[in-house]
Every structure is written in C-alpha cells, then in structure tokens.
Amino acid sequence: MEATAAWIRLMRVQTRVLDAVEQELKKAGFPPLAWYDALLELSRAPSGELRPVELERQMLLPQYSTSRLIERLVDEGLAVRRECKIDKRGLFVEITEAGRELQKKMWNAYSAAIEKYVGSKLSDPDAVKLCGLLDRLGCSCSEAKPAAAARDGVPAR
C-alpha cells in the first residue's frame, strides 16, 4: 500500500513541477521544454548531430512526436537535417548556432524554475537523499554532470 501511495505522489509531483516549469518558460517567451531537451541533447552529441531515433532515445522528456519536433526546430532555424554520407537513406539532425544560443538562453529560465519549484524546497542533504531513493528505482543521479556544467547551460541529469 505504501508503494502505491509513493507512486501516486511521485507521478503527481512530476506532473505539477513539469507543468510549472513549462509555464515559467512560456512566461519568459520561450518555446516548450521539449525544444530545450532536444537542443541540449544535440549540443551534447559529437559534432552536434544525432539520428532522429538517437535523439528520441536520449531525451529527458518522453517525445512521442519527435519527427514533428524536429520539423519545428528545422523550420525555426535551430537545427538542420542532413543526409548521412555513407548511407544516403540515413538522416542526421544537427544543431545550428541559433539552436545553441536558444538552448543557453532557455537554461536561464529553466534553471530558475528548477530552483523555484525544487531547489527552494529541498536542502542539499535532502536532494542527495532523494537522488539516493530515485537511484534505487533505476534513476541514476550519480551520472549527473558537475554543477559548473549546469551553469554553462548544460544541466546535470
């Protein structure tokens, strides 16, 4: 019974915090969080490019319409599609300089929202404890990047 109660709370908190973060981004005039997520993964990739299936697999948020998201990023000049030189049927999505700039600008609003809705409610020891509990459920906070990387627009996971 306690596991069910924990599950329900986990899902409710995740939904509420994501909704609040989305609203903060919207108020700041930015596109949805999925755009940030995709741009971040592209910026982290070698040469700034990934196959669409790799992008979908690496995104933090579930993205059921990755092809539509990629289309929007391309239309806005934040990414480009290019053919694989070896396999002409293969496609890559590559982040543009404009995409890198937007991802960094969005991080300012995103990180402020994380602080507002999570950081301000947890002490550092509480956050470490929460990461430990989530690790037991299969979410490894130990793979997180250092805080300095987060300040540069590349958040820890």
Residue ranges and their predicted role:
Residues 1, 124-157:
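C-terminal regulatory/oligomerization modules of transcriptional regulators
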Residues 1-29, 157:
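N-terminal leader segment of winged-helix/HTH proteins
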Residues 6, 34-35, 98, 126:
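N-terminal positioning helix adjacent to the helix-turn-helix/winged-helix DNA-binding module
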Residues 17, 21-24, 59, 102-121, ...:
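Alpha-helical linker/hinge and terminal dimerization helices associated
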Residues 20-62, 147-151:
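N-terminal helix-turn-helix DNA-binding core of bacterial DNA-binding proteins
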Residues 52, 70-71:
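Short, hydrophobic-biased segments on the C-terminal half of alpha helices
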Residues 71-129:
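Charged, amphipathic alpha-helical coiled-coil/dimerization segments
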